[in-house]
Amino acid sequence: MEKESLVLSRLECSMMRGLAIILIVANNFGHHVQRVHPDNEFVFCYESVAGFLESLNHIDSIFPLDLLSFYSPFGVMLFIFLSGYGLTLKYEFGSGTNTSSWSFLKNHYLKLFVMQAKGVAIFLCLFLLLFPDEIVYSGPLVRQLLMVANLFPNSPITPGPYWFFGMIMEVYIVYRLLFYQRSSILMMIVVLCSLIMMAVVEPAGDIQRYLRMNLCMALLPFCLGVLVARHWRTCTMLGSSKNCLILLGISLVLLTTCKFYFYSWLLLPVFVVAVSIAVVKLLLRYSNISSVFNWLGGLSGVLFVVHPTVRQLLLDRANESGHPYAVVFLYLFMTIVLSMILKPVFSQK
């Protein structure tokens, strides 16, 4: 597969990772800010929709943070999409075609485990320093490190955002054992089954949360990445700014509309990916901005692992501060600086 034929170039993928990590980092702190309405991520609550509509009808100084909370949960979907896209290019069309299933799963598990273990160590050091009298239970921590905590209903996950590690490992297993070099029709059938499962359970119930913290939520964006890598080899349609703007406008309207209804909410990853592709292709025309997102993309793994530690430091300020924007910017600044400092630690094999 020639490089120029790819829908998303290496640079565009890195920019998309940069966009995704900023959304993830912002989302995991923003909804703790006082007066900001929570968004629907794992469950669909009509109260959250009503809260956003109320803020839309009574715009005040906090509205930009409400808007951020409304759109920021999409970062995880982008990470999952890029995983599907990248794995397919490497292991079905690139240098990894001769990799055995055992080597594939072992290498990805160890990579996630080491990254997570370093993050947990940093988090625990801070947590025990700030709360020396608190008890840390080993059982939930071991389950989290082994990336099986998601499979246990109501099992505490420490730090909270690390639920992603267990979920993405489930995706890797299913991809390699079920989807790898097999018919895309089979993959679409499995995605349809997962959507039906989520559609028939209570939108705001515990089962919905359990399904979405595991494989079900990830299947649609991941398989979309696989399908794009397999079947959409050219992107001449998106070569002009006009077409990108049209795609961005249509997808953004559909994305926003889908967030207000439960069944369409399940299909959000499709429009999230479309919006993001249009955004990165438009930003590519501005070298200064694209270089920033490319840089953030290169730092995304460390940012993801480090940001829960910074969040823990500033949670009280988020809940009590009368200057929410100052706290949010302080959080983002501290997260980026700490990630830059610790990047060599996470780069070590």
Segments (PLM) and residue ranges:
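Membrane-cytosol interface segments of multi-pass membrane proteins
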Residues: M1-S194, E320-K349
